[in-house]
Amino acid sequence: GDHGRMYRGLAPEMVPAMYTLCSRASLILPNTTDAALLLGDPMPGVTGEAELHTAQTQAQRLTRICPRVLITGVAAGRGIACVGADRATGESLVRTPMVPKSFHGTGDIFGAVLVGRLLQGNVLPAAAQAAAVFVADCLKATPDEADERLGVWLESVLPRLMHNPE
């Protein structure tokens, strides 16, 4: 889901199936809506530090399902955060400046960069920071008048990712 509701076309029966799938993963990347759905919590509607605190609590609770959790898209003051919890090592937090744009596919880009950095040997907080910065750079490179349904303009930003592998 996103923005406090399930994606159109998905039935509520999908939530228990996603829970089962997540229990078999070593890392999950729910956004705030997905985290609420998986835990049976109310949909996110708060902003700022209240949302940050809720996400920290949810991340810890989600480690009962999966050993490593990174909740994305958490409002944190004037920024946006990824709130992580690791069953073995504890909690991590990554904050980046808020880019006031919303485009389809940014979560997919975040996940792709994160996994790439993890495969390069980065620890989760460093991989999450690199992914968050890359997505923010993509958002900044996308004109305000661009169609949000078509995603961000990442092509001009890709060289930064390729020439800065760490």
Listing of model-derived features with the role each one plays in the protein:
Residues A36, K101-L124:
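Short, small-residue alpha-helix embedded
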Residues G1-D2:
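N-terminal glycine-rich phosphate/adenylate-binding segment common to multiple enzyme folds
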Residues P125-E166:
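Charged C-terminal helix
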Residues D34, G73-G77, P97-P100, A132-V135:
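Glycine-rich beta-alpha junction loops
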Residues M6-E91, P125:
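Conserved phosphate/ATP/ADP-binding segment of small-molecule kinases
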Residues E91-S92, R117-A131:
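Phosphate-handling active-site elements
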Residues E91-G105:
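Short pre-catalytic strand/loop immediately N-terminal to key active-site residues, enriched for Gly-Thr
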